[in-house]
Amino acid sequence: MRCPYCGGSETQVKDSRPSEDGAAIRRRRVCPDCAGRFTTFERVQLREVVVLKRSGKRVPFDRDKLQRSIDVALRKRAVDPERIERLVSGITRQLESAGEPEVTSEAIGELVMAGLKGLDDVAYVRFASVYKNFREARDFEELLGTLSDGMPVPAAAPEAEGDPEPEASGRRRAGRP
């Protein structure tokens, strides 16, 4: 395996163990040329899956692209990396074992949305807004309505006239009745 730091062609495996979900082998490698250390993952590929894009173009399925799109949706969210890896591995395994040589990009998007919905609501909304090409605030409102089991999201209740604002600490500030 080529070193990602110096490009050296010979690297040595220092440690090898199965990943937590058992779907991959994690290998720690070191480059004898530059002493750089890096991690690789070895996975079984059941079959070549071809993605049929909306434009009609056919491209090979790219697990790394799937990982990146999920990472973007989960950016700055407190989700355990192992859970993210399980989601990506599960979607990949599902696509490879489906028996279909081609899968639409829409089908992959639906699998990602279903996985993110169970993982993190904010990431689900982020991904859906790009995947479904939201154009208006109403698009978000409709999606948020589905998060609460199809029940519409309640609007904030208007304040009654003459009611004082609630105090955060329970104390009134000086000079107020």
Swiss-Prot record:
Signal peptide: none
Domain of life of the source: Bacteria
Cofactor: Zn(2+)
Cell wall biogenesis/degradation in keyword set: no
UniProt cofactor note: Binds 1 zinc ion.
Pfam families (alphabetical): ATP-cone, Zn_ribbon_NrdR
Annotated ranges, domain ATP-cone: 49-139
GO molecular function: ATP binding; DNA binding; zinc ion binding
GO-annotated biological processes: negative regulation of DNA-templated transcription
Disulfides per UniProt: none
Region (Disordered): 148-177
Keywords (A to Z) from UniProt: ATP-binding, DNA-binding, Metal-binding, Nucleotide-binding, Repressor, Transcription, Transcription regulation, Zinc, Zinc-finger
InterPro entries from the UniProt entry: ATP-cone_dom, NrdR-like_N, RNR_NrdR-like
Family statement drawn from the similarity comment of this UniProt entry: Belongs to the NrdR family.
Matches recorded under HAMAP family: NrdR
Protein name as annotated: Transcriptional repressor NrdR
